Each structure stands twice: as structure tokens, then as C-alpha cells.
Amino acid sequence: MDSNTVSSFQVDCFLWHVRKRFADQELGDAPFLDRLRRDQKSLRGRGNTLGLDIETATRAGKQIVERILEEESDEALKMPASRYLTDMTLEEMSRDWFMLMPKQKVAGSLCIKMDQAIMDKTIILKANFSVIFDRLETLILLRAFTEEGAIVGEISPLPSLPGHTDEDVKNAIGVLIGGLEWNDNTVRVSETIQRFAWRSSDEDGRLPLPPNQKRKMARTIESKV
């Protein structure tokens, strides 16, 4: 059995015990108590699967947590602040743009737009977003620009549906790229997008997709009309 699997279970058991003590003092709200009940069932299932006793695992988890806390400084306990990364200027973000052949798709809480009239162009994706724990936290806006500076595509959060993950953003980028490459455009991404939002690109930012995947992605872009 993998040692990380065992130690993870032990720490989870001890942290559940701490949360249970907190709830016993009538300090937990309804969502907290609901998670506590669900996690209890989960721990029982994991314990049966691993063949481990929960009480014994809780004691071992306590020792692990105490050892970590002894080595932890007050500075390390601080929550890291988000960093805001910008590819686009304020003018590029706020500029109005128009589509000759508009296509739009809503993917979760993200809206994907593109102009399907654009063909045989080199297109660069730029984005402004926040990062925490070295991962994309919140997308503010992503836009696709031609070499001449024209906006031909966009991914933006829907105000009515807040909340998205870095995986949601990556999937939306894949849909946008698929639609643009369907018309024989060459799509590249900025350095910040390569690092935090799209880790599948090569060194020069090229985002190749096989023809069958391009067709599949292009078909997912539905008409706004």
C-alpha cells in the first residue's frame, strides 16, 4: 500500500476529528455540519477499502499534524495574495469589436465568441487574469487578436454565473482554438497563458490540434441566433 495514501487517510481522520469537536461545541453552521456528515461516510468507506482502523489512523494523523505545526512559522500560515497578470492594455480590454459571422457558445460560466469570417490569419491569444498558488484563479478576459490588432474572438465570464476553474478556462480555450483553426488560422498564445492556462503548447506558443479534434471543437461552437 502506498505510504502517501495511508498518511493522507490518517491526516484526514484527525482533521475530521477536530471539525467534529468544533461541531460538538455548537459552532458549526449548516453547510459545515453537512460536509462533516458526508466526510464521515467517506472516511468509513476509505477505512474499509484500506483495511485501516479509523481511531488508530486518527492518532497517527494527530502526530503528523503536530510535527508539521512545530516546524511551521507564523509567516508560512499567511494566505498568499493573488497576483494579477495582464497581457492586454486597458484599451485592448475595453475596445468594442464586431463580427461578420458571429458564433457564440456558453460553456459553464464562460461565454466563448468568435468571428468565423476570419480565415488564413495568424492569431494571438491574450488574457488578463489572477493567479494564486501558481495556478489561474479567475479569468477577467481573454481575447484573440490578428497581427493587425483586430479582435476576432473572446472568452469572458458570465456575470450571472460566477465561478470557474482553471480547467474550465483551458477547455474554453480549446474550443476557441478549434473554431479558429478550422478556418486555417494559425493560433498562438501569450507566455502567461502558456504558463498558467494552457500547458499543452510547444515552445513558440503554437497550439496544434489534429484535424478530427478541430472538427469536433468547431462543431461545438453554436450560432448565437
From Swiss-Prot:
Spans annotated as CPSF4-binding: 175-210
Region (RNA-binding and homodimerization): 1-73
Motif Nuclear export signal mapped to chain: 132-141
Keyword Protein biosynthesis: no
Protein's cellular compartments: Host nucleus; Host cytoplasm
InterPro entries on file: NS1, NS1A, NS1A_effect_dom-like_sf, uS15_NS1_RNA-bd_sf
GO biological process: symbiont-mediated suppression of host cytoplasmic pattern recognition receptor signaling pathway via inhibition of RIG-I activity; symbiont-mediated suppression of host gene expression; symbiont-mediated suppression of host mRNA processing; symbiont-mediated suppression of host PKR/eIFalpha signaling; symbiont-mediated suppression of host type I interferon-mediated signaling pathway
Main localization of the protein described in the UniProt heading: host cell
Any one GO molecular-function label of the UniProt entry: RNA binding
Subunit structure: Homodimer. Interacts with host TRIM25 (via coiled coil); this interaction specifically inhibits TRIM25 multimerization and TRIM25-mediated RIGI CARD ubiquitination. Interacts with human EIF2AK2/PKR, CPSF4, IVNS1ABP and PABPN1.
Family note: Belongs to the influenza A viruses NS1 family.
The name this protein goes by in its record: Non-structural protein 1
Natural source organism: Influenza A virus (strain A/Chicken/Hong Kong/YU22/2002 H5N1 genotype Z)
